[in-house]
């Protein structure tokens, strides 16, 4: 049965317009949580004729997560997408960071272009989250092998698009838990008078563009401490951050600073913990990542 695309659907139209610059002749993997953003992305891509493999990553962190995953896959198939469910194990510790690492590893494992459904609201939240970690920045539409077609539209568009399509998104209880840093930031933004999302998102986009230029000037990630030590500080720190990101590690101001010291003022420092049960050491003049001892 062909999917139903309503004639009068202004919010779904916004979603469809957002994906058009990113359409590919290849099948793309879309990370599908079952929430409104990712359901709307699958729907918009399919409405524009994009071949989609919707991958539902079940983190197994909540009771009934397997039922949620199966329902998300069912709705994706109704939209004309191929859909599979992948279960992952999330390491203990920083639940947000470790779940993200496991999720992206599962999406990349298919060796296809990967799309995720971050919106303009996510862009604003990410700017503040990264600023709190001492490394403010924004998300680019294409970054580290990930495509984000929805950075130009709002979360309200995806919610209303699902209503227009008679889709039934899952509302993750974790999105209401203030113990998660992103939820706390989101709640704080909602309490600010006016709409802070647009100016924050614009700032994030400018930073992302600046970062792209500086990253090009800095050169590719390297573990060579002598090469890093020879660079100006701003480029060196950016290169260290890129080296961590390449390994699915979120850089923080503290971790970058301590790794930088390993390169520039080496005196036998101990390992630097970088989260996820991992640490960085200097071995033979190079940075080495290993499991915490």
Regions found by a protein language model. Name each.
Residues 170-173, 194-201, 248-257:
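Short, surface-exposed acidic
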Residues 1-188:
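Core alpha/beta nucleotide-donor-binding catalytic domains of modification enzymes
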Residues 123, 199, 235-239:
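Residue-level detector of well-ordered alpha-helical segments, enriched
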Residues 161, 185-192, 236-244:
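PAPS/PAP-binding and catalytic site of the sulfotransferase fold
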Residues 178-212:
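Active-site-proximal catalytic alpha-helix in oxidoreductases
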Residues 2-37, 53, 57-59, 88, ...:
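AMP-forming adenylation/ATP pyrophosphatase catalytic core
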């Amino acid at each position: 049965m062909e999917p139903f695309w309503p004639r009068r659907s202004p919010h779904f139209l916004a979603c469809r317009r957002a994906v058009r610059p990113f359409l590919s002749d290849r099948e793309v993997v879309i990370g599908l949580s079952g929430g409104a953003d990712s359901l709307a992305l699958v729907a918009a891509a399919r409405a524009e004729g994009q071949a989609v493999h919707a991958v539902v990553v079940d983190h197994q962190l909540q009771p009934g997560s397997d039922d949620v995953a199966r329902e998300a896959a069912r709705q994706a198939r109704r939209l004309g997408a191929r859909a599979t469910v992948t279960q992952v194990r999330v390491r203990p510790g920083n639940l947000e960071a470790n779940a993200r690492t496991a999720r992206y590893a599962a999406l990349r494992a298919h060796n296809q272009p990967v799309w995720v459904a971050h919106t303009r609201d996510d862009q604003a939240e990410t700017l503040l989250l990264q600023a709190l970690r001492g490394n403010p920045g924004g998300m680019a539409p294409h970054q580290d092998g990930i495509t984000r077609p929805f950075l130009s539209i709002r979360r309200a568009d995806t919610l209303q698009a699902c209503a227009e399509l008679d889709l039934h998104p899952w509302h993750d209880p974790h999105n209401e838990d203030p113990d998660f840093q992103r939820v706390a930031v989101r709640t704080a933004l909602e309490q600010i008078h006016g709409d802070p999302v647009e100016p924050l998102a614009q700032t994030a986009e400018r930073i992302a563009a600046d970062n792209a230029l500086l990253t090009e000037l800095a050169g590719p990630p390297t573990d060579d401490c002598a090469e890093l030590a020879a660079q100006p500080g701003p480029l060196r720190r950016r290169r260290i951050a890129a080296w961590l990101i390449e390994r699915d590690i979120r850089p923080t101001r503290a971790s970058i600073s301590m790794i930088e010291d390993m390169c520039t003022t080496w005196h036998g420092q101990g390992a630097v913990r970088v989260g996820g049960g991992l640490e960085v050491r200097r071995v033979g003049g190079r940075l080495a990542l290993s499991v915490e001892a």
